Design a protein with these regions (language model features):
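Short glycine-rich or small-residue beta-strand-to-loop segments that form or flank ligand, phosphate
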Residues: 34-45, 68-72, 142-144
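A Trp-anchored, charged/polar loop motif used as the substrate-binding/catalytic surface
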Residues: 16-21, 124-128
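An acidic, phosphate/nucleotide-engaging active-site surface
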Residues: 77-153
Length: 153
């Protein structure tokens, strides 16, 4: 479902363009009570996901209870990196993803499908895993901000 679209390869979105777009999309989602935002980590700084995350915090206020940068297997972000990427977003909202201990398995991607999409390069099932906060946090909205997509480790 598309909540809002704007821009093209010939148009650079300004801060105000981003804010207007984000607010239009969030307005359509309606009122929420407990929100988790999952932006990319510092390695994706140019994506402007930090700017968007700060706007999400400004929009939702205290209902944005957790921010879980999608570290994957990267090292946790430093305070300086968080400040640089996420501006004035409160530091107490940030959680660190521990990929060795904080993941739970939701299910399994069947070997047949893995083989099909990998064009025969991989022929075994793959666990579908997420950080346990997504399941145990009782969120009524989980926002994937920017270039966060599931992938293998």
């Amino acid at each position: 479902m598309i909540y809002y679209q704007n821009g093209s390869s010939q148009h650079n979105l300004s801060h105000e363009d981003l804010k207007k777009s984000l607010i239009a999309a969030l307005d359509k989602l309606g009122r929420k009570h407990k929100i988790l935002a999952i932006p990319p980590d510092y390695t994706r700084l140019p994506s402007r996901a930090g700017e968007l995350t700060e706007m999400v915090w400004e929009y939702y206020g205290n209902t944005l209870t957790d921010i879980l940068p999608a570290l994957g297997t990267h090292t946790p972000m430093t305070d300086e990196q968080i400040s640089h990427m996420f501006g004035k977003t409160p530091r107490n909202l940030f959680r660190v993803h521990d990929w060795r201990h904080d993941v739970i398995t939701l299910g399994e991607v069947p070997a047949e499908y893995v083989k099909e999409v990998s064009e025969g390069k991989v022929d075994f099932s793959w666990p579908a895993q997420v950080n346990k906060l997504l399941v145990e946090g009782n969120f009524d909205l989980i926002l994937s901000i920017g270039q966060v997509v599931p992938h293998e480790v």
